[in-house]
Amino acid sequence: MTPWLGLVVLLSCWSLGHWGAEACTCSPSHPQDAFCNSDIVIRAKVVGKKLVKEGPFGTLVYTIKQMKMYRGFSKMPHVQYIHTEASESLCGLKLEVNKYQYLLTGRVYEGKMYTGLCNFVERWDHLTLSQRKGLNYRYHLGCNCKIKSCYYLPCFVTSKNECLWTDMLSNFGYPGYQSKHYACIRQKGGYCSWYRGWAPPDKSISNATDP
């Protein structure tokens, strides 16, 4: 079993079954939570890949060209390789080589960066302007706040450091408007609330503030 399998639990990613009956299941995560809970957050382009171990628990190693680091300077100032399970049923991540720039998040284990399907990984050109601004500084400002998931009504915040995340209630599903356009940031008086960046006003989201 590779070191990544031990990290799967920490990343809220479960492997169900065994061999032929495996599945990867991930809990929804707001990009800000993904940012704050990751050891490493970078923008990079994949320039190569190699399978370093054969068999059902093979490991894919991607060679990357790091464009920018948003989080993790003290743990790993420069990332050249990222590791993931070879099988998608074990939460392994499939990335295109020499095609796109990606936003990559992950954990550091024994000096190596590991990532997978349960991490926040997205093509850079698919990120909204608000998400890009969040990566630069807004998400970091909100790491002391707590984003509380709401899967069904009624649901409420229970402390002043919480923002209620209601994307899962939307007919459009996840990722929704709050994921794409909002950060949960501590405001005056010590209360955390949703902060809207580049997106137009949305009256359906309560306790949101303009920049």
Curated annotation (Swiss-Prot):
Residues 24-27, 88-89 are annotated as: Involved in metalloproteinase-binding. Highest levels are found in kidney, lung and brain followed by ovary and uterus. Low levels are found in bone. Mediates a variety of processes including matrix regulation and turnover, inflammation, and angiogenesis, through reversible inhibition of zinc protease superfamily enzymes, primarily matrix metalloproteinases (MMPs). Regulates extracellular matrix (ECM) remodeling through inhibition of matrix metalloproteinases (MMP) including MMP-1, MMP-2, MMP-3, MMP-7, MMP-9, MMP-13, MMP-14 and MMP-15. Additionally, modulates the processing of amyloid precursor protein (APP) and apolipoprotein E receptor ApoER2 by inhibiting two alpha-secretases ADAM10 and ADAM17. Zn(2+) binds at C24. Residues 1-23 form the signal peptide. Disruption phenotype: Timp3 deficiency results in a failure of liver regeneration via sustained activation of TNF leading to hepatocyte apoptosis. In addition, Timp3-deficient mice show abnormalities in the choroidal vasculature. Pfam families: TIMP (PF00965). The keyword Cell membrane does not apply. GO terms for cellular component: basement membrane; extracellular space. It is found in: Secreted, Extracellular space, Extracellular matrix. InterPro entries: Netrin_domain (IPR001134), TIMP (IPR001820), TIMP-like_OB-fold (IPR008993), TIMP_C (IPR027465), TIMP_CS (IPR030490). One of its GO terms (molecular function) is metalloendopeptidase inhibitor activity. Residues 24-143 form the NTR domain. Interacts with EFEMP1. Interacts with KDR. The keyword Ribosomal protein does not apply. Belongs to the protease inhibitor I35 (TIMP) family. Keywords: Disulfide bond, Extracellular matrix, Metal-binding, Metalloenzyme inhibitor, Metalloprotease inhibitor, Protease inhibitor, Secreted, Signal, Zinc. Residues 105-188 are annotated as: Mediates interaction with EFEMP1. SMART domains: NTR. Gene3D superfamilies: 2.40.50.120, Tissue inhibitor of metalloproteinase-1. Chain B, domain 1. GO terms for biological process: negative regulation of extracellular matrix disassembly; negative regulation of membrane protein ectodomain proteolysis. Induction: Highly induced by phorbol ester (PMA), EGF and transforming growth factor-beta 1. Also induced by dexamethasone. It comes from the Eukaryota. Disulfide bonds join C24-C91, C26-C118, C36-C143, C145-C192, C150-C155, C163-C184. This is Metalloproteinase inhibitor 3. The record marks N37 as: Involved in metalloproteinase-binding.
